[in-house]
Regions:
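OB-fold/S1-family RNA-binding modules
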Residues: 1-49, 70-99, 126, 134, ...
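DE-rich acidic low-complexity regions and acidic surface loops
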Residues: 20-22, 110-119, 190-205, 270-278
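A cross-kingdom feature marking solvent-exposed beta-strand/loop segments within repeated
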Residues: 53-77, 109-115, 119-120, 146-168, ...
Protein backbone atom coordinates (compact mmCIF):
# COMPACT_ATOMS: atom_id res chain seq x y z
CA UNK A 1 0.00 0.00 0.00
CA UNK A 2 1.18 3.52 -0.79
CA UNK A 3 0.96 5.92 2.15
CA UNK A 4 0.12 9.59 1.71
CA UNK A 5 0.01 12.59 4.03
CA UNK A 6 -3.43 12.82 5.60
CA UNK A 7 -6.01 14.48 3.38
CA UNK A 8 -4.01 14.00 0.18
CA UNK A 9 -5.53 10.74 -1.10
CA UNK A 10 -9.18 11.26 -2.12
CA UNK A 11 -9.71 7.50 -2.50
CA UNK A 12 -9.57 7.07 1.30
CA UNK A 13 -12.40 9.51 2.04
CA UNK A 14 -15.45 7.30 2.55
CA UNK A 15 -18.82 7.02 4.25
CA UNK A 16 -20.71 3.78 4.81
CA UNK A 17 -24.39 2.97 4.28
CA UNK A 18 -24.46 0.08 6.73
CA UNK A 19 -22.62 -1.45 9.66
CA UNK A 20 -22.00 -4.53 7.52
CA UNK A 21 -20.00 -2.43 5.03
CA UNK A 22 -17.92 -1.08 7.88
CA UNK A 23 -17.36 -4.58 9.26
CA UNK A 24 -16.06 -5.64 5.86
CA UNK A 25 -13.64 -2.70 5.94
CA UNK A 26 -12.46 -3.95 9.35
CA UNK A 27 -11.95 -7.50 8.05
CA UNK A 28 -9.92 -6.15 5.11
CA UNK A 29 -7.87 -3.88 7.42
CA UNK A 30 -8.88 -1.02 5.15
CA UNK A 31 -7.43 2.46 5.69
CA UNK A 32 -10.20 5.06 5.80
CA UNK A 33 -10.20 8.84 6.10
CA UNK A 34 -12.84 11.14 7.52
CA UNK A 35 -12.94 14.64 8.96
CA UNK A 36 -12.55 14.86 12.74
CA UNK A 37 -15.71 16.54 14.01
CA UNK A 38 -14.91 16.73 17.72
CA UNK A 39 -12.21 16.18 20.29
CA UNK A 40 -13.99 15.52 23.58
CA UNK A 41 -12.89 16.20 27.16
CA UNK A 42 -10.98 12.92 27.28
CA UNK A 43 -9.31 13.85 23.97
CA UNK A 44 -11.05 11.12 22.00
CA UNK A 45 -11.61 12.06 18.36
CA UNK A 46 -15.08 11.66 16.84
CA UNK A 47 -15.89 11.12 13.14
CA UNK A 48 -19.04 10.56 11.10
CA UNK A 49 -18.90 7.35 9.06
CA UNK A 50 -22.42 7.60 7.66
CA UNK A 51 -24.08 4.50 9.08
CA UNK A 52 -22.53 4.95 12.52
CA UNK A 53 -20.49 7.32 14.59
CA UNK A 54 -16.81 6.52 14.99
CA UNK A 55 -14.54 7.21 17.96
CA UNK A 56 -10.75 7.16 18.06
CA UNK A 57 -9.85 6.66 21.75
CA UNK A 58 -7.12 9.02 22.96
CA UNK A 59 -4.44 6.31 23.17
CA UNK A 60 -5.27 5.26 19.59
CA UNK A 61 -5.00 8.84 18.33
CA UNK A 62 -1.31 8.90 17.44
CA UNK A 63 2.01 7.18 17.99
CA UNK A 64 3.61 8.60 21.14
CA UNK A 65 0.46 9.60 23.02
CA UNK A 66 0.74 6.59 25.33
CA UNK A 67 4.33 7.31 26.42
CA UNK A 68 3.99 11.11 26.47
CA UNK A 69 6.46 11.75 23.64
CA UNK A 70 3.59 13.31 21.67
CA UNK A 71 1.38 15.86 23.42
CA UNK A 72 -2.40 15.89 23.31
CA UNK A 73 -2.36 19.07 21.22
CA UNK A 74 -1.54 16.70 18.36
CA UNK A 75 -5.08 15.35 18.75
CA UNK A 76 -6.86 18.62 19.51
CA UNK A 77 -5.36 20.23 16.40
CA UNK A 78 -6.95 17.58 14.15
CA UNK A 79 -10.51 18.90 14.59
CA UNK A 80 -12.04 19.83 11.21
CA UNK A 81 -9.19 18.07 9.39
CA UNK A 82 -9.09 14.73 7.61
CA UNK A 83 -7.52 11.90 9.58
CA UNK A 84 -6.82 8.26 8.72
CA UNK A 85 -7.74 5.18 10.72
CA UNK A 86 -8.55 1.47 10.79
CA UNK A 87 -11.68 -0.04 12.30
CA UNK A 88 -10.86 -2.02 15.47
CA UNK A 89 -14.35 -3.13 16.46
CA UNK A 90 -17.79 -2.03 17.60
CA UNK A 91 -19.49 -1.09 20.86
CA UNK A 92 -22.94 0.09 21.93
CA UNK A 93 -23.66 3.50 23.45
CA UNK A 94 -26.18 4.11 26.25
CA UNK A 95 -28.95 4.33 23.64
CA UNK A 96 -27.99 0.92 22.18
CA UNK A 97 -26.59 2.53 19.02
CA UNK A 98 -23.52 1.01 17.39
CA UNK A 99 -20.26 2.94 17.65
CA UNK A 100 -17.20 2.07 15.60
CA UNK A 101 -13.96 1.99 17.60
CA UNK A 102 -11.14 3.25 15.41
CA UNK A 103 -7.36 3.55 15.53
CA UNK A 104 -5.22 6.18 13.85
CA UNK A 105 -2.14 4.85 15.62
CA UNK A 106 -2.54 1.47 13.91
CA UNK A 107 -2.29 3.09 10.48
CA UNK A 108 0.74 5.11 11.58
CA UNK A 109 2.50 1.99 12.87
CA UNK A 110 1.81 0.25 9.58
CA UNK A 111 3.09 3.29 7.68
CA UNK A 112 6.28 3.23 9.74
CA UNK A 113 6.83 -0.49 9.21
CA UNK A 114 5.97 -0.71 5.51
CA UNK A 115 7.22 2.68 4.31
CA UNK A 116 9.02 5.15 6.57
CA UNK A 117 11.41 2.71 8.26
CA UNK A 118 12.63 1.66 4.81
CA UNK A 119 13.64 5.17 3.75
CA UNK A 120 17.33 6.04 3.53
CA UNK A 121 19.05 9.45 3.37
CA UNK A 122 18.65 10.87 -0.13
CA UNK A 123 15.15 9.47 -0.69
CA UNK A 124 12.70 12.04 -2.08
CA UNK A 125 9.10 11.79 -0.87
CA UNK A 126 5.83 13.71 -0.91
CA UNK A 127 4.84 15.57 2.24
CA UNK A 128 2.35 18.13 3.50
CA UNK A 129 3.09 21.15 5.70
CA UNK A 130 1.22 20.82 9.01
CA UNK A 131 2.44 23.82 10.98
CA UNK A 132 5.22 26.37 11.04
CA UNK A 133 7.46 27.43 13.90
CA UNK A 134 10.31 29.95 13.92
CA UNK A 135 12.88 27.13 13.92
CA UNK A 136 11.38 25.12 11.06
CA UNK A 137 8.44 23.52 9.28
CA UNK A 138 6.65 20.44 10.55
CA UNK A 139 5.48 18.11 7.80
CA UNK A 140 3.22 15.08 7.49
CA UNK A 141 5.35 12.41 5.81
CA UNK A 142 2.62 9.78 5.73
CA UNK A 143 -0.52 8.86 7.72
CA UNK A 144 -0.12 11.88 9.99
CA UNK A 145 3.43 10.98 11.10
CA UNK A 146 5.29 14.25 11.59
CA UNK A 147 8.89 15.23 10.85
CA UNK A 148 10.82 18.50 10.76
CA UNK A 149 12.51 20.59 8.11
CA UNK A 150 14.87 22.96 10.01
CA UNK A 151 14.66 26.55 8.78
CA UNK A 152 18.19 26.47 7.33
CA UNK A 153 17.21 23.49 5.15
CA UNK A 154 14.23 25.20 3.52
CA UNK A 155 16.31 27.11 0.97
CA UNK A 156 19.75 28.51 0.26
CA UNK A 157 18.37 32.04 0.49
CA UNK A 158 18.06 32.83 4.18
CA UNK A 159 14.67 33.58 5.69
CA UNK A 160 13.67 34.72 9.17
CA UNK A 161 10.59 32.49 9.44
CA UNK A 162 9.35 29.43 7.49
CA UNK A 163 6.11 31.28 6.64
CA UNK A 164 8.18 33.26 4.15
CA UNK A 165 8.75 30.05 2.19
CA UNK A 166 5.81 27.73 2.93
CA UNK A 167 2.18 27.77 4.03
CA UNK A 168 0.22 25.32 6.17
CA UNK A 169 -1.52 22.64 4.13
CA UNK A 170 0.88 23.03 1.20
CA UNK A 171 1.94 19.85 -0.62
CA UNK A 172 5.70 19.70 -1.13
CA UNK A 173 8.52 17.33 -2.04
CA UNK A 174 11.27 16.76 0.50
CA UNK A 175 14.48 14.75 0.73
CA UNK A 176 15.52 12.72 3.78
CA UNK A 177 18.64 14.41 5.14
CA UNK A 178 19.30 12.47 8.34
CA UNK A 179 17.83 9.34 9.89
CA UNK A 180 18.11 8.63 13.61
CA UNK A 181 16.44 5.92 15.74
CA UNK A 182 13.86 8.34 17.14
CA UNK A 183 13.43 10.89 14.35
CA UNK A 184 13.98 11.79 10.72
CA UNK A 185 15.11 15.20 9.50
CA UNK A 186 14.18 16.37 6.02
CA UNK A 187 15.42 19.08 3.67
CA UNK A 188 13.91 21.05 0.82
CA UNK A 189 16.76 23.15 -0.54
CA UNK A 190 18.51 20.35 -2.46
CA UNK A 191 15.41 20.00 -4.64
CA UNK A 192 15.22 23.69 -5.58
CA UNK A 193 18.16 23.78 -7.96
CA UNK A 194 21.85 24.61 -8.04
CA UNK A 195 23.24 28.12 -8.31
CA UNK A 196 23.59 27.65 -12.08
CA UNK A 197 20.09 26.15 -12.44
CA UNK A 198 18.62 29.30 -10.94
CA UNK A 199 21.05 31.88 -12.31
CA UNK A 200 20.38 30.88 -15.93
CA UNK A 201 16.91 32.39 -15.54
CA UNK A 202 18.40 35.86 -15.11
CA UNK A 203 20.30 37.87 -17.74
CA UNK A 204 22.28 41.09 -17.27
CA UNK A 205 20.20 44.03 -18.46
CA UNK A 206 16.88 42.60 -17.26
CA UNK A 207 14.72 44.13 -14.55
CA UNK A 208 13.00 41.50 -12.40
CA UNK A 209 11.17 41.19 -9.09
CA UNK A 210 12.82 40.11 -5.87
CA UNK A 211 12.42 40.08 -2.11
CA UNK A 212 14.62 41.84 0.43
CA UNK A 213 16.05 39.14 2.72
CA UNK A 214 18.84 40.92 4.58
CA UNK A 215 19.94 44.53 5.04
CA UNK A 216 23.61 45.02 5.85
CA UNK A 217 25.89 48.06 6.05
CA UNK A 218 27.60 47.03 2.81
CA UNK A 219 24.46 46.19 0.83
CA UNK A 220 21.04 44.61 0.52
CA UNK A 221 20.59 40.91 -0.20
CA UNK A 222 17.67 40.37 -2.57
CA UNK A 223 16.21 36.93 -3.18
CA UNK A 224 15.56 36.21 -6.85
CA UNK A 225 14.54 32.58 -6.22
CA UNK A 226 14.51 30.40 -3.08
CA UNK A 227 18.01 29.14 -3.93
CA UNK A 228 19.41 32.36 -5.38
CA UNK A 229 20.11 35.84 -4.03
CA UNK A 230 21.99 38.86 -5.31
CA UNK A 231 23.54 41.90 -3.68
CA UNK A 232 22.42 45.48 -4.26
CA UNK A 233 24.01 48.67 -2.99
CA UNK A 234 22.72 50.05 0.34
CA UNK A 235 19.43 51.92 0.20
CA UNK A 236 17.34 53.59 2.88
CA UNK A 237 13.74 52.87 3.91
CA UNK A 238 13.69 49.18 3.03
CA UNK A 239 12.44 46.34 5.22
CA UNK A 240 13.09 42.60 5.26
CA UNK A 241 10.41 40.78 3.27
CA UNK A 242 9.69 43.78 1.05
CA UNK A 243 9.11 43.24 -2.66
CA UNK A 244 11.41 45.17 -4.97
CA UNK A 245 12.14 45.56 -8.67
CA UNK A 246 15.85 45.07 -9.39
CA UNK A 247 18.06 45.62 -12.41
CA UNK A 248 20.46 42.72 -13.05
CA UNK A 249 23.84 44.37 -13.44
CA UNK A 250 26.07 41.30 -13.74
CA UNK A 251 26.16 37.53 -13.17
CA UNK A 252 29.51 36.07 -12.02
CA UNK A 253 29.40 32.23 -11.76
CA UNK A 254 32.96 31.70 -10.50
CA UNK A 255 32.17 33.88 -7.48
CA UNK A 256 28.51 32.86 -7.21
CA UNK A 257 27.60 36.53 -7.27
CA UNK A 258 24.83 38.52 -8.89
CA UNK A 259 25.10 42.29 -8.74
CA UNK A 260 21.80 44.14 -8.60
CA UNK A 261 20.45 47.68 -8.57
CA UNK A 262 17.18 48.34 -6.76
CA UNK A 263 14.92 50.21 -9.19
CA UNK A 264 11.78 50.43 -7.09
CA UNK A 265 10.52 49.27 -3.71
CA UNK A 266 6.91 48.34 -3.08
CA UNK A 267 4.91 48.73 0.12
CA UNK A 268 3.58 45.17 0.23
CA UNK A 269 5.42 42.23 1.77
CA UNK A 270 6.21 39.01 -0.04
CA UNK A 271 3.97 35.94 0.12
CA UNK A 272 5.18 32.36 -0.49
CA UNK A 273 5.24 31.45 -4.18
CA UNK A 274 4.81 28.08 -5.81
CA UNK A 275 8.05 26.13 -5.61
CA UNK A 276 9.98 25.01 -8.69
CA UNK A 277 11.69 21.64 -8.35
CA UNK A 278 14.81 20.88 -10.38
CA UNK A 279 15.17 17.23 -9.35
CA UNK A 280 12.62 14.65 -10.52
CA UNK A 281 14.43 11.56 -9.22
CA UNK A 282 13.10 9.76 -6.14
CA UNK A 283 16.61 9.43 -4.73
CA UNK A 284 19.77 11.55 -4.81
CA UNK A 285 23.19 10.66 -3.39
CA UNK A 286 24.96 13.96 -3.86
CA UNK A 287 23.96 17.58 -4.47
CA UNK A 288 26.49 20.21 -5.49
CA UNK A 289 25.06 23.70 -5.28
CA UNK A 290 28.09 25.71 -6.44
CA UNK A 291 29.45 25.85 -10.02
CA UNK A 292 32.48 23.63 -10.69
CA UNK A 293 34.72 26.65 -11.30
CA UNK A 294 33.63 28.44 -8.13
CA UNK A 295 36.26 29.18 -5.50
CA UNK A 296 33.75 28.15 -2.83
CA UNK A 297 32.27 24.66 -2.95
CA UNK A 298 28.86 24.02 -1.35
CA UNK A 299 27.46 20.51 -1.44
CA UNK A 300 25.38 17.89 0.39
CA UNK A 301 26.58 14.29 0.56
CA UNK A 302 23.64 12.10 1.59
CA UNK A 303 25.92 9.11 2.13
CA UNK A 304 27.84 10.70 5.00
Amino acid sequence: MKFYPEGKNPDLLKTFDSVDELKMAMINNEVIESKALLCDREHNLHVDLGAVRGIIPRLEGAIGIDDGSVRDIALISKVNKRICFNVLGFEKDIYDNSIAILSRKAVQLRCMEEYLNRLVPGDVIDASVTHLEKFGAFIDIGAGVNALIPIDMLSVSRISHPKERLSEGQSIKVVLRKKEPSKMTFSLKELLGTWEDNAKNFTPGETVTGVVRSIEDYGVFVELAPNLAGLAEPQNNLFVGQQVAVYVKSVIPEKMKIKLVIVEAFSDADVPKELTYYIEDRHIDYFRYSPQNSSKQIFTDFNE
